Amino acid sequence: MVISVDFNGSQRGVTRTRNIDVHLQKGERVDDVLSYVKDRYPDLSLSENSCLVIVNNQVTTKDRILKANDRISIIPHIGGG
């Protein structure tokens, strides 16, 4: 199955793309995709403190099981104070 991963903000500078397609096996989770993305883009910060993970427009946990055609958006945290 295939899912899509969208990059936002400064992530696009690291990945040099807006999104990628990822081929998964049935039963794989958000965390599996994040591990794949981290291996492909080692300079990309994907810790819970640096980004929010959204699947199909809903904030989710890393243990969520993915389905074909799911869309993951990785949203970087912006500022603080």
Question: Which residue stretches match the model-derived regions?
Answer:
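Ubiquitin-like/PB1-type beta-grasp interaction modules and other compact soluble beta-rich domains
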Residues: 1-80
